[in-house]
């Protein structure tokens, strides 16, 4: 049965740690601007436990057996310190500052058990799988919304940036991906369902060390082995009649085609970036950005721009597979920011990756000033400023003005005096892109650089990652990490802001 935490507990002065502390220690422990007191004031005490009511069935006595507020705050504290679960529970038991931050102000308060903590996080993930609603995201929005109200942050101007972040998985070759999936799916429950001859082949395949096979085998032999492994898996799928709900079925059809009952390996170029990169994390995608390869996820952060005498807070967090383009986040990010702040966004600062025709149309429809510090693609050789008015194009290389003619297909055509390709065509899309670039370049540099501040948020977001990898596997766990990490970042910003304001005073 759902049960709220009692917020009106009677405090025993003899159980408070500060009673046994001397001057300096007691002063620091009770300092309202110390991180532990700021955390309790602006995070722990702001958590609305009603958000998590759906996780607990009515009539189920004994559940939850710990404060939901403390369980959520523990997750935030963990990502704030970047510590392991073991270190987290050690802090909850013996670190007086961490206990104070969680609301355990007396020595008699007991920390939740590790089983309760894990069960709570698993329930959040299971609920999202079933209902497609992330309760930790709702909690993030609710807590941040409370902070926005306290500091009267308008949120009318926001900036956003994204970060490719890796999943905690090994990098596998195609052969290793298929072999590891076979090993994962074939167990004591599925093997008995195979006929004796097929079972023997599978058992032989499972004894192989795929990593050593790839390392020791030449490419031609490897291609043959990859083909044979695919044929074996095809026989398993036919025998067990497995459909797309099974991971082995998905991996097989991502890596092979079937022609006349035979498994034919797909060409490397035909493998999609959204295909399984490692069976231990089927949600992770592949992307190469600015020469850096990533197998994992793409996180987008939206934050308020600096307002005078007000902190800048993260008001939106989105996590998708690494294949998600930056410009796909914009509309949803704006809507979430408006829900948190309660105000309409009027100005958006971003980089060129967020530019797209649909986003520009969205900004125009919603009357949002879209300020980007660039646009993807190199600068055109041709200046199209006078194309529509004077029907002329300026060749920047030669300085020549060239007359343009409108074709029946709706494109503008110009004829060059030299070069292999004398005719050039300009569609409306190209013209719109040119005008957008000109508009961006005309924006004052100071205005465009407002977006750069969000890069500090990106740095802090992945501060505790190793080799740009989180500790987690799976989209749902990566989401939990992201929401908790950003709630911690907001708390630290508030703390630094209040310290700065006190120093000014």
Task: Label every model-predicted segment.
Residues 1-45, 417, 431-432, 500-501, ...:
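Charged, often Cys/His-bearing segments associated with DNA-binding zinc-finger transcription factors
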Residues 30-73:
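Basic, short loop/linker segments at the boundary and entry of helix-turn-helix/winged-helix-like folds
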Residues 44, 65-69, 80, 93, ...:
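Generic, well-ordered alpha-helical segments
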Residues 57-58, 103-105:
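Short linear capping/connector segments at secondary-structure termini
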Residues 61-65, 79, 288, 478:
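Short, solvent-exposed segments of well-ordered alpha helices
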Residues 72-82:
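Alpha-helical support elements that line or immediately flank enzyme active sites
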Residues 84-87, 92, 106, 110, ...:
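Anion-binding and metal-coordination hotspots
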């Amino acid at each position: 049965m759902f049960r709220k935490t009692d917020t009106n507990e009677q405090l025993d002065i003899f159980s408070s740690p500060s009673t046994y502390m001397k001057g300096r220690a007691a002063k620091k422990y009770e300092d309202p601007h110390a991180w532990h007191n700021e955390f309790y004031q602006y995070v722990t005490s702001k958590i609305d436990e009603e958000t998590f009511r759906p996780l607990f069935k009515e009539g189920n006595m004994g559940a939850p057996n710990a404060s939901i507020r403390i369980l959520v705050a523990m997750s935030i504290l963990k990502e704030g310190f970047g510590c392991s679960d073991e270190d987290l529970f050690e802090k909850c038991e013996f670190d007086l500052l961490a206990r104070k931050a969680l609301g355990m102000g007396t020595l008699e308060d007991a920390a939740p058990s590790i089983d309760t903590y894990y069960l709570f996080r698993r329930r959040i993930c299971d609920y999202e799988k079933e209902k497609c609603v992330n309760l930790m995201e709702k909690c993030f929005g609710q807590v941040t919304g409370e902070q926005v109200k306290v500091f009267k942050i308008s949120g009318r101007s926001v900036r956003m940036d994204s970060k490719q972040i890796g999943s905690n998985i090994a990098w596998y070759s195609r052969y290793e991906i298929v072999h590891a999936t076979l090993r994962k799916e074939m167990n004591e429950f599925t093997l008995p369902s195979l006929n004796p001859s097929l079972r023997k082949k599978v058992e032989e395949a499972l004894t192989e060390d795929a990593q050593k096979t790839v390392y020791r085998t030449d490419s031609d032999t490897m291609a043959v082995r990859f083909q044979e492994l695919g044929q074996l898996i095809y026989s398993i799928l036919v025998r067990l009649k497995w459909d797309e709900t099974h991971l082995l079925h998905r991996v097989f059809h991502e890596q092979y085609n079937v022609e006349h009952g035979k498994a034919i390996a797909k060409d490397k170029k035909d493998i999609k970036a959204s295909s399984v990169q490692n069976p231990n994390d089927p949600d992770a995608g592949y992307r190469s950005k600015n020469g850096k390869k990533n197998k994992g996820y793409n996180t987008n952060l939206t934050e308020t721009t600096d307002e005078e005498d007000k902190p800048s807070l993260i008001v939106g967090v989105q996590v998708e597979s690494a294949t998600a383009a930056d410009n796909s986040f914009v509309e949803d990010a704006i809507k979430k920011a408006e829900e948190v702040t309660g105000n309409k966004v009027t100005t958006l600062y971003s980089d060129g990756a967020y530019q797209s025709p649909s986003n520009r149309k969205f900004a125009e429809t919603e009357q949002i000033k879209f300020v980007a510090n660039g646009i993807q693609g190199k600068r055109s050789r041709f200046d199209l400023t006078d194309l529509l008015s004077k029907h002329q194009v300026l060749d920047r290389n030669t300085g020549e003005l060239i007359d343009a003619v409108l074709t029946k297909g709706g494109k503008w055509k110009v004829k060059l005096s030299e070069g292999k390709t004398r005719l050039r065509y300009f569609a409306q899309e190209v013209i719109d892109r040119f005008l957008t670039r000109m508009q961006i370049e005309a924006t004052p540099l100071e205005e465009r650089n407002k977006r750069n501040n969000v890069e500090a948020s990106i740095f802090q977001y992945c501060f505790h990652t190793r080799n740009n990898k989180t500790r987690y596997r799976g989209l749902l766990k990566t989401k939990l990490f992201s929401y908790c990490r950003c709630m911690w970042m907001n708390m630290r910003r508030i703390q630094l802001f209040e310290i700065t304001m006190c120093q000014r005073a």
